[in-house]
Amino acid sequence: MATVDGTTAPSSGGKTATVALESGGGRYGGPAPAKCSGANLALRALLFAVSLSALVVLVTAKQTVMVPFVIRPPQFILAPVPAKYTHSPALIYLLAALCATCFYSLITAISSVRLLSSSACSAKTLFYLILLDVFYAAVMASATGTAGAVAWVGLKGNSHTRWNKICNVYGKFCRHIGSSTFLALIAAIVLVLLAFLNAYSLYRRSR
């Protein structure tokens, strides 16, 4: 009986250990599922805040100054001349890009909150997010480039084309345009980071 008990105990213990190792290997040995991390949600919340701030700053880019017009030397009159973001197609394009990005960031942030409560993000969801993030990053980069070119001409002018600088007169207007362009650049960088983060999550899932 002692011999039977001695041989039975190791057998059952080895069996239990084998089951435990098999369950542990299935849990820890396989590739970890691609979970929607909190970093994804944080970046999308940051994207929404930055794009919304850039949008508000751009919409409020308005200034009216009194500019002297010579009638007959030495007579002149002062007339109000406004400067608005709607006067430039490049700034209108920036406005449209910011509106689209702000809406996109809000929708994806809400979706990220829902995905955080689930067990894992599907590979299909990650793939679509990568495509959308890259697309909006390209849109924001192009809009930032066009707005930056207009802002630079307004700041420095261009003597070859005889475009005079206006920021020495419309200081407030130029500050708004410059700030909005800088925030739009940050939004484009955040979108690139999101694309890399989702691509890494998809890579981990495929391993």
From Swiss-Prot:
Name of this chain's protein: CASP-like protein 1D1
This protein's record includes keyword Cell membrane? yes
Q: Tell whether Transmembrane helix is among the UniProt keywords.
A: yes
- List the ranges whose topology is Extracellular: 62-89, 146-176
Q: Which residues cross the membrane?
A: 41-61, 90-110, 125-145, 177-197
Top-level taxonomic group: Eukaryota
State where the protein is found. Answer: Cell membrane
